[in-house]
Amino acid sequence: MAPPLLLCLILTFLWNLPEAESNVFLKSKVANRFLQRTKRSNSIFEEFKAGNIERECIEEKCSKEEAREVFEDNEKTETFWNVYVDGDQCSSNPCHYRGTCKDGIGSYTCTCLPNYEGKNCEKVLFESCRVFNGNCWHFCKSVQNEIQCSCAESYRLGDDGHSCVAEGDFSCGRNIKARNKREASLPDFVQSQKAILLKKSDNPSPDIRIINGMDCKLGECPWQAVLLDEDDDVFCGGTILSSIHVLTAAHCINQTKNISVIVGEIDISRKETIRLLPVDKVYVHTKFVPPSYLYGHQNVDRKTYDYDIAIIRMKTPIQFSENVVPACLPTADFVKQVLMKQDFGIVSGFGRTQYRGQTSNTLKVITVPYVDRRTCMLSSDFPITPNMFCAGYDTLPQDACQGDSGGPHITAYGDTHFITGINSWGEGCAKKGKYGVYTKVSNFIPWIKAIMSLK
């Protein structure tokens, strides 16, 4: 028989056995929370769950395919992988002038804003204003590789540093009548004739001759001035530059003793109802070469018309309106780099409707393309000086004619119209193989400004 002490120990052990079991073994529901394997997620949102990228690619090296399984998106995978392999090449901001950097493996790519190029967008295309005029609405100047835009008189530079804002209702070069049209800078007569510049016709219509020309509607040639002699007959044209200045040709001035001026009219058949403006003074360029002068010991008809430019000062100011607006005076660089590279210029006048015919009572207008200098010089039997340029057609019968002399050659840039030439001379009117010859206004900008500044 077991000793009493051993029996007591056995009974005590058996009594505490259920409690010991409960402390050693977990209930199945609780145990499963620790022992059951959690299924991995491959959803697109896994990249936002802490530890996934670190577990796959930071704590241990991963493959691109493993990264792809995490992101399940090619673009996000590429972005991550380029940085993961060799670091972020864009961290130093290598793209200049607000270019956008995209990282690559061992490289980067800059996407440049317009007008910049180069690996780092470091090259400024507009540094010399030769591309799209530096994005300037009017004048462009390059200063230390920076573009400086400026505007014609009566305009101010816009807040963007490129646009030009008119400071008045009748700022220069504004074709007010055409502004509400779909193509605001091109009046009806320009839109009607744009196709002529794109094709040549073996049988051109006589309706499109400048000497039989298209009518300029009221307000579409607002810078046009008309010069009348003492008999109130039209003898030349002109261009309004300011309220007291009209630009014309020097060879017009000696054709009459008295000059009066008409502005804002497209029909001058009833001159008695039209206001004639008196002239105060006329300034002719001192270097003007008349068509006939003593050459050696002989009278030689040279017909050079060099320096064929004059300015008329009005006795009373011209009143501006929708139908009377001055043309803008350009800069010489702007003419050379921009205006003379346009498709065409605009010529208007009350001149003869045919060679040696009668002058027109209605204002006529035509668009004429610029002619390269070599072609111009080869076409003429007379000298073409550096102060002249040619415009017109060699085959189409379109040209200015007698009575149009002194009138405007205008070139539009955007919605602004600039004076680029003075109708000077030609060999006949619309003669085949010949062009109209115009005084190159850009050569006389300082002279014009000097005369206009006189009191």
Curated annotation (Swiss-Prot):
The record lists the catalysed reaction(s) as: Selective cleavage of Arg-|-Thr and then Arg-|-Ile bonds in prothrombin to form thrombin
The signal peptide, as residue positions, is 1-20
Q: Which Pfam families match?
A: EGF, FXa_inhibition, Gla, Trypsin
Q: Which SUPFAM superfamilies match?
A: GLA-domain, Trypsin-like serine proteases
What are the Gla domain coordinates in residue numbering? 41-86
MF (Gene Ontology): calcium ion binding; peptidase activator activity; serine-type endopeptidase activity; toxin activity
Q: Which GO terms describe its cellular component?
A: extracellular region; extracellular space
Q: Which domain of life is it from?
A: Eukaryota
Compartments in which it is found: Secreted
EGF-like domain residues: 86-122, 129-164
Tell me where in this chain the PTM 4-carboxyglutamate is found. 46-47, 54, 56, 59-60, 65-66, 69, 72, 75
Q: Which residues form the propeptide?
A: 21-40, 182-209
Tell me the ranges covered by the Peptidase S1 domain, including all copies. 210-453
Keyword annotations of the record: Blood coagulation cascade activating toxin, Calcium, Cleavage on pair of basic residues, Disulfide bond, EGF-like domain, Gamma-carboxyglutamic acid, Glycoprotein, Hemostasis impairing toxin, Hydrolase, Protease, Prothrombin activator, Repeat, Secreted, Serine protease, Signal, Toxin
What tissues is it present in? Expressed by the venom gland.
Functionally, this protein is described as follows: Snake prothrombin activator that attacks the hemostatic system of prey. This protein is functionally similar to blood coagulation factor Xa.
Family (UniProt)? Belongs to the peptidase S1 family. Snake venom subfamily.
Protein name (database record) = Venom prothrombin activator nigrarin-D
Native species of this protein?
Cryptophis nigrescens
The record lists the lineage as: Eukaryota, Metazoa, Chordata, Craniata, Vertebrata
